[in-house]
């Protein structure tokens, strides 16, 4: 009997092991092109047990159910449900998806409840989506935000042209007013709301899906989605086994090598994904060399159908030379040829000892660690949580110091030029070491005593402005299905941020040391010989900060605590889907000034404004309310509407203005009200979407540094800025047949400032109040009503064609049009000219093109050849202007109707890249 029991136990164990090892495999392809779909989502219906397809469109999913239904969804394709039956513990499913539109129909990865991806003909928001395959094929040497330029109301530029220095505007709102999420985690800076794309230069390599929700968006969180939300979903650990190796080359020495591999999920539920890449070379602008590495590792564990966990770490340490300051059109022309501007010209560098040297250099490493947990409590309830941490370390370098000529005017290193427009570094160093220098009309005498010494006001040197941080947070979401059509979700959003802001010497340029008197708590003056490293630390757990003794000019830390509560009620039927969302948060701000002597007065003669080194936390509440509905009239027509109101806390520099530990006396939340109407039409081969929107934004705050009044450096703070952004958007796609497809979009906006705002001016040297020439007080009103919102094109259009002459070969061409592009708000001109109007930049057309050919071989392998050319016709155009100088009686010359004194960035000329990709 004992022996029989033994064998029965073994048999039972074997049967259980067999059941636990049941596997569903398959491939997901595009029905029309027959191309595999990377990142398609395969879900066992009724559960949260799902997986993403790999580069070959393959998936492998374990289950204990012999029968069931697979739900397959992917970007821009119709969701499909496929029944399966296991035979011998296995099933192989081949799925082809039909094109729907260029939008997302569903994304299911770990932490799905926190992604807030919009679904077509369901979520009532304006949305555009780019899939992983398009990102891989079209990125090349483009900047990540530029992949979105075919989206309505999006204006993306390379700005100065440095690696990762691009920026993006949506509906006229800049980076700080666009919420960017990675796997549901908000990445906007907690002090100023900005997104520094340099810190995320490698994110494109690990992105499986990117979705732009224009307007207030569908996110449940209290986030900065005034203009829109960019949702980024990264690679999942549980993609089936396989990988890819690729190499890309481009203009100006650009190169990129990448290797990625997925283990697939084993029988015990473990899976892993790893990616490594290196990018280097230079961009189109002169002396913009760079080197960036990227690493990604994800480890997944799904012990059963109820639980799924994934740990991810990714980072992109990099350094790059910049073209930071916009350059006058006059100088572009001066260093150009035959009356044409030198679009590559960069004024921020020169040769030092025969090697290139840039005053503007950016170095950063921002690793991010995330742990996601999905818990399927029952068929009607689920729980999702993500915890994250990041230790950002880095800086941007800049000029420091100056000389004084006989007239009392400051002469900066940037004024000492060679005949070809470069900074004369040899002359800079000779001056620092005691030699006199000649400038037009006079000689400037250097008197180092007893040795060459640099300060913030004399001598020439290079400094770094450190902007490092420690960032921790968590998000949690509970979702309960109340009935077949009604569901409710609620969650928490907690964050803590500590920002480190200070300056340190970077290169003494022949001086012996920097003499600093800024830290009032140390013996004065201090001799600082330390210089910061010019390359990033590769340690993802680096939490070091330079000691106070090595910090100069200023040193302040900003602490931000954030706690939010959010909820959503959603009703969905085949015809109607509607939602109501609310979120509330409390942000608490603290400022620590390491150089401040306790008791210093914020306002002269006002004892009640005495400051401490460390302020208490100032808590400010805020909230969001949103609602919307989509109605599917029939299979071809749908309409939607949404409305929302934000009461958003001011940014850190509005809470503690004027760079002081002095709380702003009248703190007011920014107020945003948005409303949107939309219509969609679709057939089997045609789809179009039309949107109308209006956003009112009140009580905005802006601070503008580095302004000049004659020979005095000052900065301005504007309070109470009001804006109206309204417009219309259209996007469409038409597939003629399997060989030809057209896509297009058009957007037109009217984005204007309203009424007056209050301006306050301060000296840059000591942050005291400053009265501008011609003014009687440091505080006065300025009229904004004649100005357009700048830095973004009010009108854009795009038309593209995709041609597939034969299987696996594709040609794409696109035309892009920009008009009603205005200069950014020129605060320096505004505070001096009450009748200022906006400078309109010339309209322009651009053409881009690309080809790709995929050669499959073996069972699972392929080689793909890629080539892309941007700005095919080498069009010369102005992408943005920092100044607002209109043509008037004092204008000496113009370029395309623009005063040549304006400081602008020209767009890149013709650029190209070619690539080779091997998938296995």
Where in this protein do the model-derived segments appear?
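Short, acidic, small-residue-rich periplasmic hinge/interaction motif at the N-terminus
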Residues: 29-33, 40-45, 71-77, 87-137, ...
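Short acidic/polar hinge/loop motifs at secondary-structure boundaries
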Residues: 60-62, 167, 186-214
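A beta-strand signature from Gram-negative outer-membrane beta-barrel systems
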Residues: 93-95, 201-246
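Transmembrane beta-barrel wall of Gram-negative outer-membrane proteins
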Residues: 242-244, 249-280, 285-323, 368-380, ...
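Acidic/polar loop-and-plug regions of large Gram-negative outer-membrane beta-barrel proteins
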Residues: 300, 308-372, 395-464, 528-549, ...
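Surface-exposed extracellular loop regions of Gram-negative outer-membrane beta-barrel proteins
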Residues: 327, 534-545, 588-609, 617, ...
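Gram-negative outer-membrane beta-barrel transporters
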Residues: 572-575, 694-696, 717-827, 917-919
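C-terminal beta-signal and adjacent terminal beta-strands/loops
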Residues: 741-742, 818-826, 854-920
């Amino acid at each position: 009997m004992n022996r029989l029991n033994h064998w029965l136990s073994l048999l039972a164990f074997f049967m259980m092991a067999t059941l636990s090892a049941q596997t569903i495999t398959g491939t997901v392809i595009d029905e029309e092109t027959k191309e595999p779909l990377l990142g398609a989502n395969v879900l066992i219906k009724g559960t949260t047990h799902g997986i993403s397809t790999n580069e070959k469109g393959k998936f492998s999913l374990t289950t204990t159910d012999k029968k069931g239904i697979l739900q397959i969804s992917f970007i821009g394709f119709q969701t499909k449900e496929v029944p399966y039956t296991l035979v011998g513990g296995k099933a192989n499913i081949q799925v082809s998806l039909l094109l729907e539109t260029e939008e997302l129909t569903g994304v299911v990865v770990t932490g799905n409840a926190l992604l807030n991806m919009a679904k077509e003909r369901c979520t009532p928001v304006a949305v555009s989506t780019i899939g992983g395959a398009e990102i891989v094929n079209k990125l090349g040497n483009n900047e990540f935000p530029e992949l979105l330029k075919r989206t309505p109301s999006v204006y993306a530029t390379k700005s100065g042209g440095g690696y990762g220095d691009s920026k993006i505007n949506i509906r006229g709102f800049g980076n700080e007013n666009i919420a960017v999420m990675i796997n549901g985690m908000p990445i906007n800076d907690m002090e100023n709301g900005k997104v520094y794309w340099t810190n995320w230069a490698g994110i494109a390599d690990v992105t499986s899906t990117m979705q732009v929700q224009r307007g207030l968006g569908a996110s449940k969180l209290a986030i900065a989605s005034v203009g829109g939300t960019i949702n980024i979903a990264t690679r999942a650990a549980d993609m089936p086994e396989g990988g890819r190796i690729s190499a890309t080359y481009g203009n100006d020495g650009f190169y990129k090598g990448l290797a990625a591999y997925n283990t697939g999920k084993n029988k015990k539920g473990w899976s892993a994904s790893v990616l490594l890449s290196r990018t280097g070379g230079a961009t189109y602008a002169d002396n913009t060399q760079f080197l960036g590495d990227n690493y990604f590792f994800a480890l997944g564990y799904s012990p059963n159908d109820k639980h799924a966990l994934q740990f991810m770490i990714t980072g992109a340490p990099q350094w790059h030379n910049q073209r930071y300051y916009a350059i006058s059109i006059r100088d572009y022309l001066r260093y150009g040829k035959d009356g044409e501007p030198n679009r590559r010209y960069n004024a921020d560098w020169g040769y030092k000892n025969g090697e290139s040297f840039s005053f503007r250099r950016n170095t950063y490493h921002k690793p991010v660690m995330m742990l996601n947990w999905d818990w399927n409590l029952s068929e009607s309830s689920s729980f999702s949580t993500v915890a994250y941490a990041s230790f950002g370390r880095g800086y941007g370098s800049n000029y420091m110091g100056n000389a004084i000529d006989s007239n009392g005017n400051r002469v900066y290193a940037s004024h000492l030029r060679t005949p070809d427009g470069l900074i004369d570094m040899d002359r800079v160093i000779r001056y620092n070491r005691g030699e006199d220098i000649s400038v037009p009309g006079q000689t400037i005498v250097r008197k180092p005593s007893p040795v060459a010494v640099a300060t913030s006001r004399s001598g020439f040197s290079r400094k770094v402005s450190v902007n490092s941080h420690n960032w921790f947070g968590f998000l949690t979401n509970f979702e309960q299905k109340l009935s077949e059509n009604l569901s409710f979700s609620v969650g928490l959003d907690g964050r803590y941020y500590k920002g480190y802001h200070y300056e340190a010497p970077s290169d003494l340029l022949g001086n012996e040391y920097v003499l600093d008197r800024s830290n009032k708590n140390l013996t004065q003056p201090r001799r600082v010989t330390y210089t910061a490293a010019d390359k990033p630390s590769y340690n993802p757990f680096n939490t070091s900060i330079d000691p106070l003794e090595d910090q100069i000019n200023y040193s302040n830390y900003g602490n931000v605590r954030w706690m939010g509560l959010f909820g959503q009620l959603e009703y969905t039927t085949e015809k109607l889907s509607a939602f109501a969302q609310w979120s509330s948060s409390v942000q608490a701000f603290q400022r620590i000034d390491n150089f401040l002597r306790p008791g210093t007065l914020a306002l002269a003669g006002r004892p009640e404004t005495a400051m401490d080194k460390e302020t208490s936390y100032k808590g400010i509440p805020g909230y969001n309310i949103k609602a919307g509905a989509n109605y599917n009239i029939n299979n071809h027509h749908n309409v939607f509407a949404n409305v929302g109101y934000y009461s958003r806390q001011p940014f850190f520099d509005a809470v503690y203005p004027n760079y002081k530990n002095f709380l702003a006396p009248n703190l007011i939340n920014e107020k945003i009200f948005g409303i949107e109407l939309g219509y969609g039409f679709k057939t089997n081969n045609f789809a179009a979407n039309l949107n109308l929107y209006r956003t009112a934004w009140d009580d905005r705050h802006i601070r503008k540094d580095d302004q000049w009044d004659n020979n005095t450096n000052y900065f301005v703070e504007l309070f109470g800025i009001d804006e109206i952004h309204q417009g219309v958007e259209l996007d469409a796609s038409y597939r003629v047949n399997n060989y030809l497809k057209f896509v297009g979009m058009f957007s037109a906006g009217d984005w204007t400032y309203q009424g007056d705002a209050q301006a306050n001016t301060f000296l840059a040297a000591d942050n005291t109040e400053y009265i501008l020439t011609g003014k009687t007080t440091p505080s006065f009103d300025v009229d904004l009503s004649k100005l357009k919102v700048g830095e973004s094109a009010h009108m854009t259009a795009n038309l593209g064609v995709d041609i597939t002459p034969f299987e696996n070969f594709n040609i794409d061409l696109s035309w892009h049009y920009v008009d009603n592009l205005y200069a950014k708000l020129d605060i320096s001109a505004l505070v001096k000219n009450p009748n200022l109007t906006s400078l309109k930049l010339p309209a322009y057309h651009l053409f881009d093109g690309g080809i790709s050919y995929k050669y499959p071989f073996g069972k699972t392998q392929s080689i793909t050849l890629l080539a892309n050319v941007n700005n095919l016709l080498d069009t010369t155009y102005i992408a943005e202007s920092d100044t607002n100088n209109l043509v008037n009686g004092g204008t000496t010359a113009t370029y395309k109707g623009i005063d040549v004194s304006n400081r602008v960035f020209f767009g890149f000329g013709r650029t190209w890249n070619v690539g080779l990709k091997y998938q296995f």
